[in-house]
Regions:
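A broad, structural surface signal
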Residues: 41, 80, 84-91, 141, ...
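Generic detection of long, well-ordered alpha-helical segments
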Residues: 29, 33-34, 75-83, 113, ...
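A structural signal for alpha-helix termini and helix-coil/disorder junctions
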Residues: 46-49, 88, 92, 145, ...
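P-loop NTPase catalytic core of nucleic-acid-dependent motor ATPases
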Residues: 50-77, 155-158, 162-163, 169-220
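Extended, Lys/Arg-enriched charged tracts that mediate electrostatic binding to polyanionic substrates
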Residues: 25-42, 120-169
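Noncatalytic partner-interaction/assembly domains of nucleic-acid and motor enzyme complexes
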Residues: 32-99
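Replication-associated primase and helicase/ATPase modules
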Residues: 1-48, 93-125, 201-202, 211, ...
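Intrinsically disordered, low-complexity coil segments
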Residues: 54-57, 74-80, 96-122, 141-151, ...
Length: 220
């Protein structure tokens, strides 16, 4: 159960299940679907580790890509994700529910079919909301609290044993080259690719280095 509660599907199902129950109890209730916070939770499960809000008051957002963190203007790419990827997620869920409903027996499974219809109706309303400016603004506001990292600025580029290159991160402590990860908290980069030193490929460079070191530290 603990693992399930950390999945996107778990939170998405909650947004359409709790509200569909309300609709069944009160058919005249023109619900808009789940609350802004509930939908923001789905977004957080989708993108935790890829986005961070470093300043809730001023709306400062960062995105992890290409092995390091980049600051993004007002979280524009996250807002676009609400309009595109998150809507697609709900649309796929609608298709899944409709296909399941078709497979049920119209008579013996009538209650189950009605329950699915209620979920589909709620999901459709959420899909509509995810394309509305005001709704997206409210979801972004709720997302600030969820994605907020109060120690983000303190951790940025604070590890002296890590060096970010265009194609990965050199970890001097572990003596390895690896993909960057969000927990590295790197923003600065050499902007050049790292290549392992090989005698065949870097023969002349190795010779120059040895020559330089011998002159710098001559053997007596």
């Amino acid at each position: 159960k603990a693992v399930l509660r950390n999945t996107v599907g778990y939170y998405l199902d909650n947004t359409i299940s709790s509200m569909s129950a309300t609709s069944v109890a009160n058919p005249t209730n023109d619900t808009r679907g789940a609350g802004d916070f509930d939908i923001a939770m789905v977004l957080y499960q989708m993108l935790k580790g890829e986005y961070i809000c470093s300043d809730v008051k001023h709306g400062h957002w960062w995105r992890f890509r290409k092995h390091r963190w980049f600051e993004i203007d007002s979280g524009t790419t996250l807002r676009k994700t609400i309009s595109v990827e998150l809507r697609e997620l709900y649309t796929s869920k609608i298709t899944e529910l409709q296909n399941y409903s078709v497979s049920l027996d119209p008579e013996s499974d009538e209650d189950k079919r009605n329950s699915i219809k209620q979920k589909v109706d709620v999901a459709l309303k959420i899909v509509m909301r995810l394309g509305q400016t005001n709704d997206k603004t409210n979801i972004m506001k709720e997302s600030k609290d969820l994605f907020y990292d109060d120690e983000f600025y303190e951790r940025l580029d604070s590890n002296p044993y890590l060096l970010c290159c265009k194609n990965g991160v050199i970890d001097f402590k572990q003596k390895c080259f690896r993909p960057g990860c969000p927990e590295d908290y790197l923003t600065k980069c050499t902007d050049i690719n790292y290549y392992p030193l090989t005698s065949s490929r870097h023969k002349s460079s190795i010779g120059e280095i040895h020559d330089f070191m011998e002159k710098l530290f001559p053997q007596k």
